[in-house]
Amino acid sequence: MRMIERWFPCAEVSEASQVGWGSGNAESSLWVWFAKRPLVQAKAAVLTSLLPWPDDEAEQRRLQDLVRRALTGRAAANAEIADELAKHYPATPAVVDPFSGRGMIPLEAARLGLNATGIDYSPFASLGGALLADYALRDWSQEPALPFGESGEQLFEERLLSDVRLVLDEVGRR
């Protein structure tokens, strides 16, 4: 039996959702999505879906406390969570979200080092979720530098200046 079947930290999720992590704008401002879910809710869903519900009450309380600590911040208790998941899953578990929308569940699962996949009928949601939960977390250090040096910047300076003047002139006329 999974933890989510017996217990979910509703009060902690509600409290952390009011405060948010960091600026609160990073993930949610990338694109507008009609069902904006807090990151803490996704993290709680991932953790409680993967962790077992033990028979021993002391062990239940220990795991509940671990989940509560993990919900206090973006990277809170991640090392302890990784150790706990390694006890229960010899291979890295896969997390699949069949209606991922903005991709918050795959994002939080990926931040925990899990194999995460998000699926959605909407091509826009699929692209956005991939950009947020897949491409952003990849190691791009081996990619070649972009072929724009200072000369490339100079080519665009005049065009940018011209475009800004055009917009400001239009704003001034209105």
Where are these regions (language model features)?
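S-adenosyl-L-methionine-dependent nucleic acid methyltransferase catalytic domains
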Residues: 1-174
